[in-house]
């Protein structure tokens, strides 16, 4: 399992990619593999406020429904609408096609508090 080095990670298996003043968020390869085949993704509306460690959406797989937890505080500025018609992107391409939301962070320094790729890899090996 390849863990991209340029991202930050939460304990709930979300990734964050800094893009200028914004942050792109999705779920990790580890998370999608644990969930199995994704059949539906529910995401917030543009303009919604998300709060760190609180649910901002959910993914439904053939096995279960799992909540998505915000890794940082911020305002949703973009939602990946491709996931409405193609939720399988989460399984096929969790770091590219299956990003979930783009957020304008309330405090960009929160991102630095998330795990590095190395720390995330250690955590997933313990699970």
Curated annotation (Swiss-Prot):
Keywords: Lipoyl. InterPro entries: 2-oxoA_DH_lipoyl-BS, Biotin_lipoyl, GCV_H, GCV_H/Fam206, GCV_H_sub, Single_hybrid_motif. GO terms for cellular component: cytosol; glycine cleavage complex. Its cofactor is (R)-lipoate. Disruption phenotype: Strains are lipoate auxotrophs. The requirement for lipoic acid can be bypassed by addition of both acetate and branched-chain fatty acid (BCFA) precursors. One of its GO terms (biological process) is lipoate biosynthetic process. SUPFAM superfamilies: Single hybrid motif. The glycine cleavage system is composed of four proteins: P, T, L and H. Belongs to the GcvH family. PANTHER family: GLYCINE CLEAVAGE SYSTEM H PROTEIN (PTHR11715), GLYCINE CLEAVAGE SYSTEM H PROTEIN-RELATED (PTHR11715:SF3). This is Glycine cleavage system H protein. It comes from Bacillus subtilis (strain 168). The gene is gcvH.
């Amino acid at each position: 399992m390849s863990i991209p080095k340029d991202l930050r990670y939460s304990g709930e298996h979300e990734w964050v990619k800094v893009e200028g003043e914004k942050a792109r968020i999705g779920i990790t390869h580890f998370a999608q593999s644990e969930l199995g085949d994704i059949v539906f993704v529910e995401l917030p509306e543009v303009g919604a406020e998300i709060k760190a460690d609180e649910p901002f959406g959910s993914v439904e797989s053939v096995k279960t429904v799992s909540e998505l937890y915000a890794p940082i505080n911020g305002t949703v500025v973009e939602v990946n609408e491709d996931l409405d018609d193609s939720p399988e992107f989460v399984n096929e391409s969790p770091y590219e096609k299956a990003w979930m939301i783009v957020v304008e962070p309330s405090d960009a320094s929160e991102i630095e508090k998330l795990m590095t790729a190395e720390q995330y890899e250690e955590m997933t090996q313990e699970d």
